Every structure is written in structure tokens, then in C-alpha cells.
Design a protein with these regions (language model features):
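Generic recognition of short, well-ordered alpha-helical segments
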Residues: 51-54, 87, 119, 123
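Membrane-interfacial amphipathic helices and adjacent loop/beta segments
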Residues: 77-85, 192
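Short glycine/proline-rich turn/loop motifs
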Residues: 89-90, 110-116, 303-308
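Short aromatic-enriched loop/helix-cap "lid" or pocket-rim segments at secondary-structure transitions
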Residues: 83-86, 247-249
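Amide-donor transfer/coupling interface in amidating biosynthetic enzymes
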Residues: 1-75, 99, 103, 169-171, ...
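Glycine-rich, highly charged phosphate/nucleotide-binding loops
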Residues: 84-103
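Cysteine-nucleophile active-site neighborhood
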Residues: 104, 109-178
């Protein structure tokens, strides 16, 4: 499933340079196969915008080659952005109005930073729900990540996320809860997923709303669930798109915050992430941050260089397989006309015909 570089978005050339297959537009238009058009609503803050963009587009581009993929990043004007980031978005991103007019086959929605206890009080809430309501009736499936999962579940089912006693931060082992679901076809029954969140929606809350639990963890909680129809909305509380060093970057950010007295307590190590020599380096950086805080000296670290080659990615292959399955299922039910949600004969209340199997 090759990506198509249909615009001058730098991520396309970055991925091509890293060895990923990215077709030129000229080559793509001469291939006689049905393409998929995927919206990518990127709500991440400026510092993570391009990394998140690259991570999700890479996942899409890693899928089997049964179709071409046109990925359309877009954002929401209500999100607070720097001038440079606004310039980047204006230059490379699509706008929702255009995508709504031309149609999409599927939609991916990222997380976002929030400032209010209630998600409905965020400036992006109404614009986000406009996108979600349109997508529910117009795309084959919506894939929600992290905070987007909490927001969309609140909107559709009235589920309120609950604060955790401490941040769920690290890499956790999960088990497949629905081995017969097509989204989990040929997936390892046990796999890792990174989490980085302060809030949670529990199995009990999801099941009370009629959702299908797909994968969960004793330590990490529910990672994946599906809407009652089992496909039109897929919810993830973890971050399967993360790079091997994503949690490392978060940890380093917290070390700098502690050294500069922007947080009161020492940051914990992300759970189940550092091991052996990498953990020793992480603890040494923690001590250095504490000393800088006490003395007022400038804090700097070499942690990223110190642990280079010592961090394991134990989730990426499964993430690729799940996204591959998701897009394959989208391909199987979407209409040839991307302005139409499903092909003729597909039941919106049971798009994958799972009721027939019972």
C-alpha cells in the first residue's frame, strides 16, 4: 500500500529518504487501482505536530500494497499555534471544508493538549465535534487516538473520563480481548503499547455504553475498543504510533521542567521502558536534574545520545498490522464514490457483517 506524494508536504520526502515507498503523483495516476483517501486531523501541539504527522503517515504507508493512499493532514483553527506552525499548516495542510466537499474514505484523529478539566470547555470542542459528526455519516471508519478517544466517547456516549491516581506512563503488555474480530486478524495475542495519559475510560464504562473491547492490559487498562457497530469508530487510549524514543523525549522534557522548578516532584521513570544500561543513564540524568535544581545551575543532558541503540521498540510491528487490517476493512466496505459512505449492500449498523457470524 504505497503512499502518494500528492502535495509538497515535507514528510513525504522525509519518508522516501528513509526508505519508505512513496509514489509520485504522476506515477500514481497511471496505476489502474482504487485509491483510498484518508483524512488526518492533527491536533497535537506545535512541538509534536510534525512528529505525530510523520508517525501516523508512516503507519499508513507501511501497509500491504493493495491500494494507493492519499493522506490529507488538516488541523483546527481554534487550536493555539505559533506563527511558524500556522505558516506550515497553511502551506502543507488541507482545510476541512475542502475535504468535506471532496469526500474521504476514512479519518484518523490525534490527541491534543488540554487546559480545562472538562473537555467541552476547550476552544477546539465545537469545531472537533463538527468534524466528528460529519465523519460519522460520511466516512467508513474513524480511528481515534488518546485524547480524541475521550472526546469522541464523551460526544457519542456521554462517557466521562476519570482522572488516574498517577500518570499512566510507560510501555504495557496487552492481550487481545476479541480474537474473532477482523481488525485483530493475525495479530499477536499479546503485544505492547506505549501509554502517556492522566485520565482513563474503563472497561466497565465502555461495556455499559455497548462498545466492544478489543485489547486491554492489567496495568495499562483498555487500549482498543470499537463502536457498537464494531467498525465505524475505533478507539485507542494508547500510542501505538510512537517512535522508540518518544517516551524518552517526554522524560527529558520533564527533567528540564524539574530542574527549572516548573514541576515540584521528581519525574518517575516511564514504566517498563528503560532497562539495563539505559535505566542507569536515565537515573543519572535524574540526579543531574536534581543537582541543577538545588544549585541553580543550567541543566543540560546527553541522555538521548547515551541511550542511543539501547531502547527497544516492542509495539511497532503490531501497530502496523492493526492499521493494515483497518485500512483493508475500509477498502472492503467504502463506496467507489468517496462522497458516499459505504458501497451498496453494506449495513451501517453492521458494516463488517459480524452479526451474520453469530
Amino acid at each position: 500500500m504505497p503512499l502518494v506524494a500528492h502535495s509538497k508536504l515535507p514528510t513525504f520526502s522525509d519518508l522516501r529518504n528513509q526508505g519508505h515507498e512513496v509514489l509520485t503523483l504522476d506515477r500514481a495516476v497511471h496505476q489502474d487501482i482504487r485509491e483510498l483517501h484518508i483524512g488526518f486531523l492533527n491536533m497535537m501541539p506545535d512541538a509534536a505536530l510534525r512528529a505525530t504527522e510523520r508517525q501516523f503517515i508512516r503507519l499508513v504507508g507501511s501497509c500491504n500494497r493493495i491500494a494507493q493512499f492519499f493522506v490529507y493532514p488538516f488541523s483546527l483553527p481554534a487550536l493555539d499555534r505559533s506563527r511558524d506552525t500556522l505558516g506550515y499548516i497553511e502551506r502543507y495542510y488541507s482545510d476541512f471544508e475542502t475535504l468535506r466537499d471532496t469526500g474521504l474514505d476514512a479519518l484518523i484523529i490525534t490527541g491534543a493538549n488540554v487546559a480545562n478539566p472538562k473537555l467541552e470547555d476547550e476552544a477546539f470542542w465545537e469545531p472537533l465535534m463538527d468534524v466528528v459528526d460529519w465523519a460519522w455519516d460520511n466516512v467508513a471508519s474513524i480511528l481515534c487516538s488518546c485524547l480524541a478517544t475521550h472526546a469522541v466517547l464523551k460526544h457519542f456516549h456521554g462517557i466521562d473520563r476519570q482522572p488516574l491516581p498517577k500518570k499512566r506512563w510507560g510501555v504495557y503488555s496487552h492481550r487481545v480481548s476479541a480474537t474473532d474480530h477482523p481488525l485483530l486478524r493475525d495479530i499477536n495475542t499479546r503485544f505492547d503499547v506505549p501509554h502517556s495519559r492522566y485520565n482513563d475510560i474503563s472497561r466497565a464504562q465502555l461495556e455499559a455504553a455497548g462498545l466492544k473491547i478489543l485489547a486491554e492490559s492489567a496495568e495499562g487498562g483498555v487500549h482498543m475498543a470499537a463502536s457498537p457497530d464494531q467498525f465505524r469508530a475505533i478507539y485507542m487510549q494508547g500510542h501505538p504510533e510512537y517512535d522508540a524514543n518518544s517516551l524518552l523525549k517526554e522524560y527529558r522534557r520533564e527533567l528540564y521542567r524539574y530542574a527549572n522548578r516548573e514541576r515540584d516532584k521528581l519525574p518517575p521513570l516511564p514504566e517498563n521502558y528503560f532497562s539495563g544500561e539505559a535505566e542507569r543513564c536515565a537515573l543519572a540524568a535524574l540526579d543531574a536534574a536534581g543537582q541543577a535544581r538545588e544549585t541553580g545551575a543550567a541543566y543540560d543532558d546527553t541522555l538521548e545520545a547515551d541511550v542511543d541503540g539501547l531502547l527497544d521498540n516492542t509495539w511497532g510491528d503490531t501497530a502496523k498490522a492493526i492499521i493494515n487490517n483497518w485500512l483493508g476493512l475500509v477498502y472492503g466496505v467504502t463506496n467507489l464514490d468517496r462522497k458516499q459512505q459505504f458501497m451498496p449492500g453494506v449495513d451501517p449498523d453492521d458494516p463488517l457483517s459480524l452479526k451474520e457470524r453469530k
